[in-house]
Regions:
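N-terminal transmembrane-helix/juxtamembrane module of multi-pass inner/ER membrane proteins
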Residues: 1-64, 119, 217-218
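Alpha-helical transmembrane segments of integral membrane proteins
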Residues: 8-16, 80-85, 157-161, 181
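Aromatic-anchored segments of alpha-helical transmembrane domains
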Residues: 21-22, 90-96, 163-174
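Membrane-interface loops
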Residues: 29-42, 72-156, 204-218
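Membrane-embedded alpha-helical segments of multi-pass membrane proteins
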Residues: 56-63, 135-139, 184-188
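Hydrophobic, membrane-inserted alpha-helices
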Residues: 63-67, 140-145, 163-171
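Interfacial helix-loop-helix junctions of multi-pass membrane proteins
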Residues: 107, 111, 128-132, 167-195
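Hydrophobic transmembrane alpha-helices
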Residues: 144-148, 190-198
Length: 218
């Protein structure tokens, strides 16, 4: 039976996860008494607070798991290319978090419904920093772009990834976890990272260092 995660994908996934943790949690070590910037736009005040979207926000983790596994199973080249771009993007996120830290005013939760209680808990465990660019949006965008980079994934799967990405993007602003600028920053960061990874042939670099790669017999 074919492994869920190919052996050649283990190292790229591990590196991507490590860099993600370093960028997100490590950046907070540098903040301290930092002055924060606000990137709220007029449109952000128009967007309503919809607690029910906490379901979509949490289900994003399922999309990421499925999306990255499918990307890694596609081929070595696609796996190395997308995961390399993912690592580049997280390095950019780290720089933004440290050198241009942003924050926002979150929604005032007065109710006690299940959804409102869940959002209140989210607010308590996730401080309003490390916002620009939005990692939540970044991950969903990479899953969607990876579906189109792949030559093997079907049209219906791509449509599902598009819909999932749209819903996740919407959830970040409807829960007042992010502002519109954070979403735009995620797209720009991802596209730049994909471009840079392609220009630098990062897939070839991964092929050289990946000691776990299964090489076909000569």
């Amino acid at each position: 039976m074919k492994a869920l995660i190919p052996k050649y994908a283990v190292l790229p996934l591990a590196l991507a996860f490590a860099v993600n943790c370093a960028a997100y949690f490590g950046a907070r070590l540098f903040l301290g008494n930092t002055s924060y910037h606000h990137m709220t736009l007029p449109i952000d005040s128009i967007i309503p607070f919809v607690p029910a979207f906490i379901v979509v926000y949490l289900l994003a983790y399922v999309q990421w798991a499925v999306g990255y596994i499918m990307i890694c199973r596609d081929s070595r080249q696609v796996c190395y290319y997308v995961m390399g771009a993912e690592i580049i993007a997280k390095c950019i996120c780290f720089l933004c978090f440290v050198f241009y830290p942003t924050t926002m005013v979150r929604a005032e939760i007065t109710g006690s419904s299940l959804f409102e209680t869940a959002v209140r808990y989210l607010y308590e465990i996730d401080a309003p920093n490390n916002l620009f660019p939005s990692i939540h949006c970044l991950e969903s965008y990479f899953c969607m772009r990876g579906a189109f980079i792949s030559k093997k994934l079907s049209g219906w799967y791509r449509m599902i990834m598009i819909l999932a990405a749209i819903l996740v993007f919407a959830s970040t602003v409807l829960l007042k976890q992010h502002v519109v600028a954070d979403m735009a920053g995620a797209i720009i960061t991802a596209e730049f990272a994909l471009w840079f990874a392609r220009k630098t042939h990062i897939d070839q670099w991964f092929a050289k260092i990946n000691f776990l790669e299964r090489r076909p017999p000569q």
